[in-house]
Amino acid sequence: MKFKSLITTTLALGVIASTGANLDTNEASAAAKQIDKSSSSLHHGYSKIQIPYTITVNGTSQNILSSLTFNKNQQISYKDIENKVKSVLYFNRGISDIDLRLSKQAKYTVHFKNGTKRVVDLKAGIHTADLINTSDIKAISVNVDTKKQVKDKEAKANVQVPYTITVNGTSQNILSNLTFKKNQQISYKDLENNVKSVLKSNRGITDVDLRLSKQAKFTVNFKNGTKKVIDLKAGIYTANLINTGGIKNININVETKKQAKDKEAKVNNQVPYSINLNGTTTNIQSNLAFSNKPWTNYKNLTTKVKSVLKSDRGVSERDLKHAKKAYYTVYFKNGGKRVIHLNSNIYTANLVHAKDVKRIEVTVKTVSKVKAERYVPYTIAVNGASNPTLSDLKFTGDSRVSYSDIKKKVKSVLKHDRGIGERELKYAEKATYTVHFKNGTKKVINLNSNISQLNLLYVKDIKNIDIDVKTGAKAKVYSYVPYTIAVNGTTTPIASKLKLSNKQLIGYQDLNKKVKSVLKHDRGINDIELKFAKQAKYTIHFKNGKTQVVDLKSDIFTRNLFSVKDIKKIDINVKQQSKSNKALNKVTNKATKVKFPVTINGFSNLVSNEFAFLHPHKITTNDLNAKLRLALRSDQGITKHDIGLSERTVYKVYFKDGSSKLEDLKAAKQDSKVFKATDIKKVDIEIKF
């Protein structure tokens, strides 16, 4: 069982991420558009195309109603298609990357509309630099052949023995069988372990229940007509061995001791009760259970009444404390009655016998919550367009509110209904709300003003609230710079642009990060591939006609700063070496493996303790971060996204010289101080979701 399942449940669930949310971090945004997403005049990028696909696993296909979604007329690589294929394999058939690596065969075929096709091996990890147009693809068929032959062979070598379970004279139909290896010599002790296992899983009978039972035995019926009865309570076994192929079936019989419970049930006295909550009474099938001895007092009786109020009607101690009425009436069989207040801490010293009680009536009248809640209708107009709003602003508690309270409510519904947050309001041309009173007056409040109105007003005097926002164009905050990417002389049209902030000057080092980000996002070229490329550079074309060429492989940058508004466009050019993969493998093979123990929340042996470093005598915290994240993902399935959603993910590095250092795995930047991997004594990781 993976450690991830110990510390999180429905991340699951709960956990939902969209690839679109990463556009800002990838620094490759669509062309400038206004904040108002409801405007029909905005350009939303590519139109979509649906490509049908099939999945065949071990020769079996399933009907798949969904399709793979791509941008229409977009140039994509086979690596992009492979990512899509792996995603649907995992989603539709539960086949992970590890399953693919261990499979006999894993490939997909791209069928083009011109009749040609291309077969790609999912296990190879080698991708051609060719780009294909999504509109040329007719269909995609996926074929995976997993290694199940060994399991099939084992299944044939197994024998299924039917069994029955009888508990207290009652039998249930059991469709499963006991599984043994064919013609295996087993002892009665082994057979007993199997019997105890099915007793626990099918009927919930444990070893303790068997020891306390009146009778517990199982009968082995052989194919030759003989049988053997074994006492499950004895713990004594014969040394005889039996052949699994000679067993016909097994009958299990258990008789538990229920007499004590039956006797106890007879001495309990049942008292009927009813609950009247705010004038409404519901039928209650259960009774209050009391023992004949000893006598009970009214304090214990009050505790029982409060318990059924909580379980049957959800009325807690707090609700009772603020209730208008809260009492119960005890009716006796002799015609008398007694009223007890649930909020009183004074009890009489009288004792009452449960046999003398005829019934108990509980009456509770809670404070009406309607008076404490007030609703004010509102409208929202963004850039002159108003949508009908069916909900109202809800005010609870005090009947008087301040303009500061109203402002918080207004900002909340702007965020919830129209997706306008604090940042958009800050740069909006206009952001106001108007409070219309029932006496005909009105008050206009600026949402961006920090001046607070000290006046308090009654919510019941407000007729409605009109919210008006005019967003400023995002171009005032951001500039969108067009760019091109040429890889090995091949250029593909790119509809998106680099999104750069206008609020401050930018340097070549910052621009380098943006360029590397779009190279990785658009063409799948990472830092290692850039390192081994023949040429990797980009040219900045300024609006004044000047150009500046920057080498992506160099770590030396000029200190010049310039305005984003002065950039006309950026051309990116990468020439890859044909033997880069071999060179990369050669470097990887030279990596030095360093061992040190790693624990997660105090548990050891959950992740690998062996890490490969290219330069173990010269690493940074960032290098260690990458290795730990990789180990968490591969060994425990904890991804970078899971770490981002966690409440706390830190690790402490203990060095051999006695020093230690605490680092945050969620942080983007770490200390650049260099140290030796061989100096690490151990690493303790703490994850809290």
From Swiss-Prot:
The keyword Isomerase is assigned to this record: no
Protein keywords: Repeat, Signal
Gene3D superfamilies: 3.10.20.120
Pfam (any one): MAP
InterPro entries: MAP_dom
Domain of life, per lineage: Bacteria
Signal sequence interval, chain numbering: 1-30
Entry domain remark: Each MAP domain contains a 31-residue subdomain that shares striking sequence homology with a segment present in the peptide binding groove of the beta chain of the MHC class II proteins from different mammalian species.
Protein name according to UniProt: Protein map
This protein's encoding gene: map
